[in-house]
Amino acid sequence: MEPFTIFSLVVASLVFFACWALVAPNTSKNLPPGPPKLPIIGNIHQLKSPTPHRVLKDLAKKYGPIMHLQLGQVSTVVVSTPRLAQEIMKTNDISFADRPTTTTSQIFFYKAQDIGWAPYGEYWRQMKKICTLELLSAKKVRSFSSIREEELTRIRKILEFKAGTPINYTEMTIEMVNNVICKATLGDCCKDQALLIELLYDVLKTLSAFNLASYYPRLQFLNVISGKKAKWLKMQKRLDDIMEDILKEHRAKGRAKNSDQEDLVDVLLRIKDTGGLDINVTDEHVKAVVLDMLTAGTDTSSTTLEWAMTELMRNPDMMKRAQEEVRSVVKGEHVTETDLQSLHYLKLIVKETMRLHAPTPLLVPRECRQDCNVDGYDIPAKTKVLVNAWACGVDPGSWENPDSFIPERFENSSINFMGADFQYIPFGAGRRICPGLTFGLSMVEYPLAHFLYHFDWKLPYGMKPHELDITEITTISTSLKHHLKIVPFPKSSLAK
C-alpha cells in the first residue's frame, strides 16, 4: 500500500478516536492524579525518552507516588514508591496478577502460552509450578555449574591472549551469557545457535519497541497494512522451525540417564510425556516456555555484569577490596561456585548494582483483573499498571544517599532479592516475581568473581575513573549507552 494512503488512514483513525474519546463517559470518578493529557495521544509523549523510568520518577515528584497516565486509549497507573508497590504486588496481588494482551506476545509466545505473558489462571499456575520445582530450582541451577565453568575458561583464554589491549567487556559478557543460557536450555541440540540468538534479540527488540497499535487497540489493522504483522509472523515461523528441530533432536537422542544431565528441554519433554499435571502439555507449550528461558535472562544478566564492572572501575578502592577478598578466599587455580558462599563483599556489590542500576527498571506491566481501590483511588478493570522498581530502589524515604553506589549499605541488612522488601525489587514481587532469580544470580556472581580473581583491569588510553561515561539508554534493558571498553592484565602469579 502506498505510504500516503497509510498515512491518510492513520490520521483519519486518530481523528475518529479523538472524537470518540471526547464523548466517551469516564467509568471512574476517582482516578489517581496525573499530568495533563494531550488530545488524542494523552501522555504517550512523556514516555518517549531514552530513560522513561527517570521521567516517571520526576513526574511522581509532582503528581504523587500513584499516578494516572492516558497512553492513547490505554488507561495506565504508575506506582513509584515501596509502599505503593506493596499495595500492587502484595495487598492486591491477586487483583493485579494478569498481563496485558499484546499482539507481539501472542505471536512470539504461541498465544502467550509461556510463563511471562500467560494470563493468570490454572494454566499459568501449573507452568509456574514446573518452573519453580523443575526448571529453575536451586538444585537444577547448580547442575549447570560445569557449563558456566567451561564458558568462563574459554573467556579466560581469550582475555589472556588479548592482555594489555582494550576489550569490549559489554559484548564479551553478552556472548558469555548467551552461550551458557543456550547450553543449559538446549544442550548440544542446536546447530543454528547463531541464527537463534539473532532472532531472539529481534524478538526482544520488537517486544520493547514503540508500536502505535499497542496504545490504540482498535487500530490493530495498522499492523497489517504497515506490514509489521507479516514481518512478525515471518520471524515467528523462522523461530518455530528452529524450535521444531530442537525438539526432534532431543527426542532422537533419548532421555538423559539422570536428572543432573538433563537440559531444560529434556525436563519439559519428560514432564510432557509422563504427565502428572492438571493440564495437557503440548509441544507448543514446551516451545513457548523454552523461548521464555532463552529470552528472560539474555540481556538482564549481561547488563548487570556491565554495570557492576563499570562501578568498580569508577571506584578503585572498591575494586581493590573486592579483588583482595576473592584472592584470599580462592585457594586453587580456579574460582569454584562453592567459593561464592564466602565472597561477602562481592555479593554486596551485586546487590548494590541491582539497586542503583535495575536491569528492568519498569517491571513487566501488570493488568488489573477487576475493579479495585488502591490508596483511596479507583482502579478500573483492564487498567495497565507499571511498577517503577528503580524508583523504589532510590526512594529517599527508604535509602540514605540513594543516588550513590555504596555496597556497604547492605552489610548486616536482611534486605534481599526475594520480593518481601519493596524498596528493593529488581526481580519483582508477589505471584509474578521472576522465577529465574537463582539462575540470574548465578550468571552474575560467579563470572564477576572469575574476572576479579584472574585479572586486573584498567581504563584505556589514560582515562580517569571519573571520566567514564555512564549515560544510560533503555532498549531491551537499561544499559550503558556506550559499551564498556577496558583493559585486562592477567595476574602474573596466576597466568599460565
Curated annotation (Swiss-Prot):
Cofactor requirements of the protein: heme
GO molecular function, one term: heme binding
Xref: PROSITE patterns: CYTOCHROME_P450 (PS00086)
Parts of the chain that traverse the membrane: 4-24
Positions with a binding annotation for heme: C434
Catalytic EC class: oxidoreductase
One Gene Ontology term from the biological process aspect of the record: sesquiterpene biosynthetic process
Sugar attachment sites: N26, N168, N280, N412
Tissue expression remark: Expressed in floral glandular trichomes.
Reactions catalysed: germacra-1(10),4,11(13)-trien-12-oate + reduced [NADPH--hemoprotein reductase] + O2 = (+)-costunolide + oxidized [NADPH--hemoprotein reductase] + 2 H2O
Record EC number: 1.14.14.150
Keyword tags: Glycoprotein, Heme, Iron, Membrane, Metal-binding, Monooxygenase, Oxidoreductase, Signal-anchor, Transmembrane, Transmembrane helix
Function, as annotated: Involved in the biosynthesis of germacrene-derived sesquiterpene lactones. Component of the parthenolide biosynthetic pathway; parthenolide and conjugates are promising anti-cancer drugs highly active against colon cancer cells. Hydroxylates germacrene A acid to 6-alpha-hydroxy-germacrene A acid, a precursor of sesquiterpene lactones that spontaneously undergoes a lactonization which yields costunolide.
Listed name of the protein: Costunolide synthase
Species this protein is from: Tanacetum parthenium (Feverfew)
